[in-house]
A protein has these predicted regions:
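Conserved acidic segment of CheY-like receiver
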Residues: 1-12, 17-18, 49
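Acidic, metal-coordinating helix/loop segments flanking the phosphotransfer/catalytic sites
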Residues: 32-48
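His-Asp phosphorelay/catalytic-motif detector in bacterial-type signaling
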Residues: 47, 72-80
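Two-component signal transduction core modules
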Residues: 49, 102-103
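Conserved phosphotransfer microenvironments
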Residues: 51-69
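Alpha4 helix (beta4-alpha4-beta5 surface) of REC/receiver domains from two-component response regulators
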Residues: 62, 83-102
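C-terminal output helix
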Residues: 107-116
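The C-terminal output helix
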Residues: 117-134
């Protein structure tokens, strides 16, 4: 069973992700503030962290960078990172944050499930940043 942490300010985003992953053998945890992500990753060790670009006080890009730095220093376990972008042009920011994959909102449930499976099946050092096609 995989553990997925979803960080998004908007309840509709968290609900959309939870609904998309409901049929899979996945535990979905939620936080609404960017500053809470690091603690949740340290406590629960999720295999995948799904970050919305809009997280109350700390956006998805900043959280992704923080998680990479903390994992590199050995303070939190490594997790795959999926960024949920607001628009196609945000791919530039996602690359700067070294996200493992990106999806452009609105999220298609099937695409989200496939992307999650690809990320969880990938070797830890393999980058799949362009594995998930963007949604129009």
């Amino acid at each position: 069973m995989a553990t997925v942490l979803v960080a998004a300010y908007g309840k509709w985003v968290r609900d959309q992700v939870r609904t998309a992953l409901a049929a899979s053998d996945t535990t979905v945890l939620e936080v609404t503030r960017g500053q809470d992500v690091r603690g949740a990753v340290a406590e629960f060790g999720p295999e995948l962290v799904i970050l919305d670009m809009q997280i109350a006080n700390m956006g998805g890009v900043a959280v992704a960078i923080d998680l990479h730095l903390e994992a590199g220093a050995g303070r939190v376990p490594e997790s795959k990172i999926l960024l949920l972008l607001d628009r196609e042009h945000d791919r530039f920011l996602a690359k700067r944050a070294d996200a493992d994959a990106v999806l452009v909102k609105p999220i298609d449930a099937g695409t989200l499930r496939r992307t999650m499976k690809q990320l969880l099946a990938a070797a830890p050092s393999a980058s799949t940043a362009d594995a998930a096609p963007a949604q129009a």
